[in-house]
């Protein structure tokens, strides 16, 4: 079972710092667990805080602007392609820790098939990790627009 933690608050409130603190705590307490950092903040600062320059996002997959690290395998369905592209944009941070960036994802009100396909691919990705930490915008609607999933704990950072 995946544990999901969302850290939210207004810009500049320390969300990224707190997200990284929780990462360290989880790494110390559960070194064998796999952890996914999910940067769902429009500023996308979480990757930068590790010295990473992450340019590929879920938004890029949605809009066809994803820059591939590898060649696209042939004969895939659209769903298989989206799942493959999600794997392609995962960036390793350290042992057992990966990061993925969503950036802007659109609205759940959109009836386009890509919305459901991305939701399904994200759910499948989340299930592969023991712990997922979401670094979110001030409004959790951005997380809800990306994926329909239950969050175990939400931390609201205020200054």
Residue ranges of predicted features:
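Walker A (P-loop) ATP-phosphate-binding motif of ABC ATPase nucleotide-binding domains
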Residues: 4
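N-terminal phosphate/diphosphate-binding loop that engages ATP/GTP or pyrophosphate donors
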Residues: 25-94
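Cytosolic-facing regulatory segments adjacent to core modules
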Residues: 82-89, 99-138
């Amino acid at each position: 079972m995946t544990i999901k933690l969302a850290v939210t608050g207004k810009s500049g409130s320390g969300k990224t710092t707190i997200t990284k603190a929780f990462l360290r705590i989880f790494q110390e307490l559960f070194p064998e667990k796999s952890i996914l950092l999910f940067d769902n903040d429009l500023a996308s600062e979480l990757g930068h805080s590790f010295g990473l320059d992450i340019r590929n996002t879920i938004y890029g997959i949605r809009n066809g602007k994803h820059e591939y690290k590898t060649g696209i395998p042939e004969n895939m369905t659209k769903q298989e392609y989206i799942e493959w592209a999600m794997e392609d944009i995962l960036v390793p941070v350290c042992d057992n820790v990966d990061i993925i960036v969503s950036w802007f994802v659109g609205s759940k009100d959109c009836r386009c098939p890509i919305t459901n396909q991305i939701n399904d691919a994200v759910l499948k990705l989340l299930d592969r990790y023991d712990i997922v930490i979401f670094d979110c915008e001030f409004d959790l609607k951005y997380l809800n627009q990306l994926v329909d999933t239950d969050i175990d704990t939400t931390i609201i950072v205020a200054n």
